[in-house]
């Protein structure tokens, strides 16, 4: 009888321990299972599964970086390429943010070492998408220049959904829409045309509607001095004589050399016998845009705000 009682107690104890163990395992599994959303983007039309509110993010797109910063999410940034950071993002030079290579040459080993929950890339890293995806869920958030505002807003809203910041994004986009309406009114009132050029080591590229910098025409309402510029990412190669012949009322200048830390060539482009007599130069309407923001960044909540202001201030000079 005594042996039977001891055996019964042992069996009951084993059942209780087993039940507690299963409950503990179940609770742990529940805690570690994260909510996910599916993000459709240019490099994965079926969608990439992304964890909600990721704690560590590696960002290769400066526009997305400034959106995260604008939304108060700078603390989740684990790493970024620091080589040519635009001035307005200089806070991210701090050592608490890891340097993960350059925009064109990522340090995949460093990215993997950080063990991120999410990686955000854009056009300059698109060819490395598969390599990034082996490390962590990777999404492409670059703007489509042919549909600039649509893609810009979509990118911001995507970040809002991932981080539960949808209301904040909505407010920021409303402010941007208001600022765009203001710059368009200014452009319409002036009724002048403009030409966007990029100087690169003495060479010149022009950008028209639907091109990389076409938002100056398509979104901000500045009439193009030349309607026939071929839309492309790198612009249409042009000469000093072309600028003279086109004779724009406003000349918007981006200096690639300055943006990437090399020698500026804007004076060579603007201050020469061919260009000095165009309307824009004679009337003091040459607008030198912040090259790092326009060439390296753009498409973020903060960069878009700055770009609108630059164009509006330039038109009101």
UniProtKB/Swiss-Prot annotation:
Pfam assignment, any one: Peripla_BP_2
GO biological process, one term: iron coordination entity transport
Covalent lipid adducts (N-palmitoyl cysteine), residues: 20
Coiled coil spans: none
Lipidation (S-diacylglycerol cysteine): 20
Disulphide bridges: none
Location of this chain's protein in the cell: Cell membrane; Membrane raft
Residues covered by the Fe/B12 periplasmic-binding domain: 56-317
Quaternary structure (record): The complex is composed of two ATP-binding proteins (YclP), two transmembrane proteins (YclN and YclO) and a solute-binding protein (YclQ). Interacts with FloT.
Function recorded in the entry: Part of the ABC transporter complex YclNOPQ involved in uptake of ferric-petrobactin. Petrobactin is a photoreactive 3,4-catecholate siderophore produced by many members of the B.cereus group, including B.anthracis. Binds selectively iron-free and ferric petrobactin and the petrobactin precursor 3,4-dihydroxybenzoic acid (3,4-DHB).
Protein name in UniProt: Petrobactin-binding protein YclQ
Organism of this sequence: Bacillus subtilis (strain 168)
Species classification: Bacteria, Bacillati, Bacillota, Bacilli, Bacillales
